[in-house]
Amino acid sequence: MIIKNEWLIVGFITSCHGINGQLKVKSLSDFEERFLKPGMRWLQKESEHPSKIELISGFKQPGKEIFIVKFKGINTRNHAEQLKKCKLLVKSDKLPKLKKEEFHLLELIDLEVKTLENDELKIIGKVINLENEKNNLLIIELFKNQKKVLIPFVKEIVPLVDIKNNFLIINPPNGLLEL
């Protein structure tokens, strides 16, 4: 899960690459420079606090959302094995600037959720968090019963996001809100 105003998960270390401490990272980011540009990053093992690590280099595997990265001090396969399943994080206050119509996923948290019923917009809940480990899912708390539901963040189900006016519209398939 992503917690607003703290950390953003941008990738997962999936496995080692070779014998010199390189690692494969599955990207969850649209910004490739997070895996290519040298500098400080943060790694997090399961429920531990994030720790700083320096990215030395990286390159993208052709045709995949996988990057091969090299961190300072990780020089053997044995060292690299210890980092498998770690999350690669960035601080959410260091997010890149976007174009006018674009937004960061973190900006979806706390938006009102509306549906169109009988040609009228009805507020049904709010986005309380995101699930982003495999798919982009909105975690929405419904006002009528405080139930939490997962909504896939795809154009067919979430056709409109209005960050400026603090709401989004969902068009859920029948039964999705009752699960």
Curated annotation (Swiss-Prot):
The keyword Nucleus belongs to this UniProt entry's keyword annotation: no
Species name: Prochlorococcus marinus (strain AS9601)
GO biological process terms on file: ribosomal small subunit biogenesis; rRNA processing
Principal localisation: cytoplasm
Family as reported in the entry's similarity comment: Belongs to the RimM family.
Keywords for this protein: Chaperone, Cytoplasm, Ribosome biogenesis, rRNA processing
GO MF term list: ribosome binding
UniProt-listed SUPFAM superfamilies: PRC-barrel domain (SSF50346), Translation proteins (SSF50447)
InterPro entries: PRC_barrel-like_sf, PRC_RimM, RimM, RimM_N, RimM_N_sf, Transl_B-barrel_sf
Job of this protein: An accessory protein needed during the final step in the assembly of 30S ribosomal subunit, possibly for assembly of the head region. Essential for efficient processing of 16S rRNA. May be needed both before and after RbfA during the maturation of 16S rRNA. It has affinity for free ribosomal 30S subunits but not for 70S ribosomes.
Subunit note: Binds ribosomal protein uS19.
Keyword Cytoplasm: yes
Protein name per Swiss-Prot or TrEMBL: Ribosome maturation factor RimM
